[in-house]
Amino acid sequence: ETEYMPLSAAEYYAQFNDANDFYQKGPSFSESGNVTSTMAKGLKQDFFTQVDKVIDGNQNNVAVLRFTHAEIMIPLATSFELKNMMSPLPLTQTYNYQNSSWRGYITYGS
């Protein structure tokens, strides 16, 4: 039991939310052609451009900070392949905790 709902209900809603994020922002289907991580391509490229500038001594800033929402943070994390984040499922398989290690809370800490 949690303070607000039975543990079984909390687990159900957590898995439902992760499934929703998996398809809308995460790795999605194998057949999707990585469409979600493609959205983050520009941000990923800029990230490495900034790192290269630091390495080359051409960066005047201590850090380049960006504000973003889960709608782009999850695709960015997916494109970095963090903690097995880049594991799409076949179109014939439905996401659940038994067949995928992908979890939204790992990606954006909520």
Model region roles, listed by residue range:
Residues 1-110:
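Non-catalytic terminal regions with compositionally biased, polar/charged low complexity
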